[in-house]
Amino acid sequence: MSKKIIYQALPRLWGRGKFSDWDEASLRYLQTLGVDYVWYTGVPRHATGKPFVKGNPGSPYAITDWRDVNPYLAEDPARRLAEFDELLARTHAAGFKVLIDYIPNHVAPDYQGPICRFDWCDGDWTDTCKNDWSAAGTRAEMLDILRFWASRGVDGFRCDMVELVPADALQALIAAVKADFPDLIFVAEVYQKDNYRRYLDEVGFDLLYDKSGLYDTLRAVCCSGATARSITWNWQWLADLQPRVLNFLENHDEQRLGSPEFLGDARRGLAPLACSLLLNTAQFMLYFGQEVGEDGIEGADGRTSIFNWSDPPELRELYASLHGGPALAPDEAALLERYRAMLSLAKRPAFAEGGTWDLVYCNGDMPRFDPDRHFAFVRYTEQEAWLVACNFSDRPAALRIRLPRELRDRCPRLPEIASAYVKPWDARLLRIR
């Protein structure tokens, strides 16, 4: 699998909050980022305007009707499914595939349909009721839901909290729907690392979040003083699973890089970005506005709210800049260009399909290389090789990085020592062959 880029977006917070706001200009913008899949979050109809609902309009994960879409997303609510079909057609015509959410664990308390459910919820998800997967009606309906959306042209599903659902049921569902729609992809939200291989090899998911792996590792390096060596330990643990995990630095559940609760400045996210995007052949997910520094400041916890109407300024400015409005602010434009450059590089064969050589093990004795705050690796094919040097510190680093003989034997014409000047919390990408 070549490296795929997934772009997650909540249509309710883009433009005027309508399906139609994902127009040709918006989709052309995604083309400049090298996106392959657009994950439209919050499409199936969820509960709103009820006492149990969290926020206004409410959570996209409290579904009240699995065969409908949210009326507020349509220009004409009476045509809302037709307008979603038109969004699918526009997105496909622009060269992208479409993901939507599949939420097998729960529904909203006011759900009416064949899914059997209990009168209790998991944790603090008080706007939901737990699904009863022991009921044949639940299993049949959850399969029919997948077929309903796949038949409309949806290309895959991001599957919510799958560890809370019987694995054998999910395995049967995936096998059954793929018999009819073999090109569908299923992306699993899995948190227990010991379950990774099971959900990929046995249950049948195509990709799964590496939240508890690389995301948590990079966050600890950035925020808790953890050693950068732990990045090595994570990919070593993943081993052959690396191409089938989905790396990310932001999504709707996590705090924004630029939020005070994370890095405080989105520009400090370039070092972790280089590792998450470029270290291996894992797939990568980008959360809308991340590339221009959206900081979640309009919320109370550093997240862009999935519960309430909001007007994130960076998203507003990005949309306006694509539709004849003012250009992005210089700092936003500069960050966007850095993202574009790295995303473009990620599509080159050396990064999309090539080998990785982690250089930390052979540079611990180099006087300018601090293996706790610096991380370096080479990505290579027979035709080219790139050095990526990351600086997780507040001080600039003038690094001299040793390239071991084993690597040079595999990649002729590489230097024995490479030099890289890396700004604080930044990454340097150098073609060395």
What are these regions (language model features)?
Residues K3, G34-D36, A94-F96, G153-D155, ...:
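Short, well-ordered coil/turn segments that N-cap beta-strands
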Residues S2, T48, N251, R256-E406:
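Loop/helix patches that line or flank the sugar-binding groove of alpha-linked glycan CAZymes
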Residues L88, D144-R147, D160-V245, F262-A266, ...:
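Active-site-proximal helices and loops of the catalytic beta/alpha 8
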Residues I5-Y7, V38-Y40, V98-I100, F157, ...:
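Hydrophobic faces of well-ordered beta-strands that scaffold small-molecule active sites
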Residues A9, L30, Y40, W66, ...:
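Conserved, mostly hydrophobic/aromatic
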Residues R12, V43, I103-V107, V162-L164, ...:
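Active-site beta-loop-alpha junctions enriched in small/polar residues
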Residues I417-R433:
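C-terminal beta-strand-rich structural cap/linker in extracellular carbohydrate-active enzymes
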Residues K3-Y37, T41-R152, L173-F181, N195-R197:
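Substrate-binding/active-site clefts of carbohydrate-active enzymes
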